[in-house]
């Protein structure tokens, strides 16, 4: 039976949330547009019956373990760190309490393409001063984490430690069933409970409200001399009729408990939700993988950053000691001079775009280093961000793309030229090959060198990601075909129109991106000068445009490709042509 002593008690709690410290300017901009909407909805929210929470599907996988139930606690404990085992000397530990959205799978290693954000949380904390320990486990609710896993974590707590509690996706479930027995009562009332026989544990059991369990965590964290942080849940891949990410009702409940208990609250649901709302639908979708709740590495990284930003930019005085242990929260950006107010043309590519580029004009040269010879630098700033050995995948994974993306402003241009390093062994230690296709396809591979798992996408997919990101920032992407190689089958220079050329065309057809065919413009130039009956003689004559091998160019070859870019821009009457000399 459900017992309530103060039926109307919950109606008035949200006024307390007005005193929860708001985030600094960045977070204020994201949150305030939702704030008054939440106040208006609050009265009705509390009096709704059962909410539609996440009753997660049962995923498959090689592990043969059901990720959304605690049916393999023994196996999970072999992969989760023993509570407190990551502590270094007398340093504090930041414990993460959550479910599969924080730690996916019993191993949490991404072998199913899904990642929990807790895996990436340590990126934002100084490991010399604090350990980040992910104690989350798939399938846990606020209640059964507290009953099954929390006691061991509680014993490991020491004064000065920190605990983030962000849990609730699995709370709308049966109370006493044989398989899970993990449900909790909606809301925050302390005096609401239900009793029954727990078939999973074979004992009489009592179930309390969501708010009750949060208070239990807070009380016991304080008893240990540690610091509690309540955090709302990461958003789902679910949208309202305006196409915006649906916000979770637990946000209001956690905010109330935090306010009344006097602990910091970080609205992860809103911070990440606002970011996702600013993306294209295509981009929103690839932040999730396999279902509507679990995230890809993209989504997990986004949520880890949002959690870090929520802590770092909070004005809550209790968080100041933790803020002093944080790193990498500010966006990584390209150091480009904006003082003139001129637009910037960013160039992204590989060693054919940026190479040794020696002052004496010897050795290998990339054409991007000569872009200033074709652009009028009194009108536009040239920023060559290409780097040797990069493919689309590696340029992204190395963080090079993130710096360009974070630096973009409306009116900028981005030249994208990849291909030479993109096709090869997908799992070797170079970690740069992509699926040879332009389709939106991906697959999980295990990398041979270190055994890690990575969800690898197609050549076309990575290009489409770059294109979409550039447009999101109000800048203009321009796709460039790869430079030609010094190969002369049948006495004419090699054309790669049936592989890369086809993939470029498919990306163009799908995205409508602007395109300059440097490959064929430069190839036409070389054919006109050197084509003949003897392939070897053709190659020898053309060698003056190349250096070291058949791919990399000399200073003269780099000049040729830079001129091909300018020619292509003029032929297409592209707006960027207005910035040429």
Predicted regions and their residues:
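Bacterial Sec-dependent N-terminal signal peptides
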Residues: 1-7, 12-52
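Serine-esterase "nucleophile elbow" of acetyl-processing enzymes
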Residues: 52-136, 151-163, 179-188, 332-386, ...
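Short active-site-proximal "capping" loops at secondary-structure junctions
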Residues: 102, 137-142, 170, 353, ...
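Short, solvent-exposed loop/turn segments at secondary-structure boundaries
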Residues: 106-110, 241-245, 357-361, 395-396, ...
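Short, basic, glycine/proline-bearing loop/turn elements
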Residues: 134-139, 201-203, 350, 382-390, ...
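N-terminal post-signal-peptidase region of extra-cytosolic proteins
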Residues: 141-152, 391-403
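Alpha-helical cap/lid subdomain in secreted, periplasmic
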Residues: 152-297, 301, 308-323, 403-552, ...
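Acidic two-metal-ion nuclease catalytic site recognized across multiple nuclease folds
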Residues: 323-335, 580-581
């Amino acid at each position: 039976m459900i017992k309530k002593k103060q039926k109307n008690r919950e109606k008035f709690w949200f006024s307390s949330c007005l005193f929860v410290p708001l985030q600094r300017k960045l977070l204020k901009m994201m949150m305030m547009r939702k704030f008054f909407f939440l106040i208006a909805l609050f009265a009705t929210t509390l009096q709704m019956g059962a909410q539609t929470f996440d009753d997660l599907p049962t995923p498959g996988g090689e592990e043969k373990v059901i990720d959304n139930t605690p049916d393999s606690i023994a196996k999970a404990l072999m992969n989760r760190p023993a509570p407190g085992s990551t502590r270094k000397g007398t340093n504090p530990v930041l414990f993460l309490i959550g479910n599969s959205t924080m730690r996916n799978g019993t191993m949490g290693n991404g072998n199913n393409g899904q990642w929990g954000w807790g895996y990436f949380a340590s990126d934002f904390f100084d490991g010399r001063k604090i350990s980040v320990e992910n104690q989350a486990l798939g399938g846990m609710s606020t209640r059964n984490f507290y009953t099954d896993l929390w006691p061991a974590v509680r014993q490991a707590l020491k004064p000065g430690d920190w605990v983030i509690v962000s849990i609730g996706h699995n709370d709308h479930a049966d109370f006493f069933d044989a398989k899970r027995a993990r449900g909790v009562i909606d809301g925050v009332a302390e005096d609401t409970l239900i009793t029954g026989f727990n078939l999973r544990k074979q004992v009489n059991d009592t179930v309390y409200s969501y708010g009750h369990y949060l208070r239990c965590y807070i009380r016991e964290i304080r008893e240990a001399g540690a610091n509690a942080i309540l955090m709302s849940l990461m958003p789902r891949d679910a949208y309202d009729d305006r196409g915006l990410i649906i916000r979770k009702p637990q946000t209001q409940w956690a905010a109330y408990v935090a306010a009344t208990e006097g602990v910091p609250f970080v609205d992860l649901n809103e911070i990440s939700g606002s970011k996702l709302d600013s993306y294209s639908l295509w981009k929103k979708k690839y932040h999730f993988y396999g279902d509507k709740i679990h995230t890809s590495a993209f989504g997990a990284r986004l949520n880890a950053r949002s959690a870090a930003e929520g802590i770092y930019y909070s004005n809550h005085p209790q968080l100041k000691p933790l803020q002093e242990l944080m790193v990498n929260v500010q966006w990584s950006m390209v150091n480009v001079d904006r003082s003139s107010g001129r637009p910037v043309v960013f160039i992204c590519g590989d060693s054919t775009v940026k190479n040794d580029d020696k002052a004496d004009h010897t050795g290998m040269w990339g054409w991007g280093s000569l872009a200033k010879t074709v652009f009028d630098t009194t009108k536009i700033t040239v920023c060559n961000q290409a780097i040797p050995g990069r493919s689309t995948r590696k340029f992204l994974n190395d963080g090079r793309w993130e710096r360009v993306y974070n630096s973009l402003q409306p009116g900028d241009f981005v030249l994208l030229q990849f291909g030479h390093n993109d096709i090869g062994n997908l799992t070797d230690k170079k970690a740069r090959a992509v699926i040879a296709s332009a389709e939106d396809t991906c697959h999980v591979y295990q990398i041979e060198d270190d055994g890690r798992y990575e969800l690898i996408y197609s050549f076309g997919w990575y290009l489409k990601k770059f294109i979409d990101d550039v447009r999101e920032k109000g800048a203009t992407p321009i796709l460039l075909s790869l430079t030609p190689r010094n190969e002369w089958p049948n006495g004419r220079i090699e054309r790669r129109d049936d592989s890369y050329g086809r993939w470029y065309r498919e990306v163009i057809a799908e995205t409508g991106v602007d395109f300059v065919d440097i490959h064929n413009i430069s190839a036409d130039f070389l054919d006109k000068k050197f084509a003949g009956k003897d392939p070897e003689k053709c190659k020898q004559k053309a060698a003056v445009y190349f250096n070291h091998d058949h791919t990399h160019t000399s200073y003269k070859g780099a000049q040729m490709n830079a001129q091909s870019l300018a020619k292509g821009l003029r032929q297409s009457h592209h707006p960027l042509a207005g910035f040429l000399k």
